[in-house]
Amino acid sequence: SILTKAKIGALQSSTAVSGIFDVGTDSDGRWMAEKFKGLVMQLEREANVIAKETRRGKGNYVICSSDVASALAASGMLDYNPAMSTNLNVDDTGNTFAGVINGRMKVYIDPYATGDYACVGYRGSNPYDAGMFYCPYVPLQMVKAVGEEDFQPRIGFKTRYGMVANPFVAADGTGTNRANPYFRIFRVDDIMV
């Protein structure tokens, strides 16, 4: 998946620990909203690194945990009007689209995140301009069966697919872990500074 293939981010000299962005120490600010703007700046820096490594474009979407999305909303930089008509409702069980940062970077919430992280990625306007491709063999197949316990009819659905890396990223198409330049991931620590 994207999260396992992404290169480690937050490698700039301004971060105390490589691969980890600590909101308390790595961003400068007098109060939380200013420190959260430092997190937005780190996302922009990762987007710039993607542009330099791929020569295709800056990162244009973020996959993050719900706490990171809440921090982005608290920074005042996340426009949640496209996502919600009233206000950002960061909820792991609801819609995963949280909003847009600075009018160009879409933010999605990972409902299965166990820790705080952010992954910046790039996908171009062309469907072939991406870091990974979903390749279905059988789009969707319905299977009918009878339950062993109560002999009630059951319906199941299955699909077969493959995930392959962009062939211009990896020569063999397998997508080595932590090597795809279309994605940058880093851990976010100390959100509640």
Where are each of the predicted segments found?
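Long, contiguous amphipathic alpha-helices that act as assembly "spine/axial" helices in icosahedral shell
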Residues: 1-11, 55-62, 151-159
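Alpha-helical scaffold segments that mediate packing/assembly in large oligomeric complexes
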Residues: 1-45
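Sequence/fold signature of self-assembling virion shell proteins
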Residues: 26-49, 60-61, 67-193
